[in-house]
């Protein structure tokens, strides 16, 4: 019996019809007890939790309470948002409310400091 090379086998398969190749694959699965189904790649897992933690770069400034100095907080809210007196008053009185969305860390901390100095309770989210 002549020894078949990989090249001979590949040429023989290349000359086969698609149906014959499917039958050949099925026969090989039965004979060798394997499956030709693709194996799913294992999920990529970060080496450490530090790789997963991403520092947030945009913050929402949330007014949680206006405290005892409502007028001072309304004035500060007006200067931060550019709203009119009535709109700023309504916003402050509807606390908890977002005063500024998508602020940078420095800007958000500055707004938080200003509002807290005016007597408000503020959270950064």
UniProtKB/Swiss-Prot annotation:
S-S bonds: none
Domain of life where this protein originates: Bacteria
SUPFAM superfamilies in the cross-refs: ClpS-like, Ribosomal protein L7/12, oligomerisation (N-terminal) domain
Keyword tags: Ribonucleoprotein, Ribosomal protein
Organism: Ruthia magnifica subsp. Calyptogena magnifica
CDD domains from the UniProt entry: Ribosomal_L7_L12 (cd00387)
Molecular function terms, GO-annotated: mRNA binding; structural constituent of ribosome
Protein name: Large ribosomal subunit protein bL12
Cellular component aspect of the GO annotation: cytosolic large ribosomal subunit
Keyword hit for Ribonucleoprotein: yes
Classification via Pfam families: Ribosomal_L12, Ribosomal_L12_N
HAMAP family referenced in this protein's UniProt entry, alphabetically: Ribosomal_bL12 (MF_00368)
Family: Belongs to the bacterial ribosomal protein bL12 family.
Subunit structure: Homodimer. Part of the ribosomal stalk of the 50S ribosomal subunit. Forms a multimeric L10(L12)X complex, where L10 forms an elongated spine to which 2 to 4 L12 dimers bind in a sequential fashion. Binds GTP-bound translation factors.
Primary role: Forms part of the ribosomal stalk which helps the ribosome interact with GTP-bound translation factors. Is thus essential for accurate translation.
Biological processes annotated in GO: translation
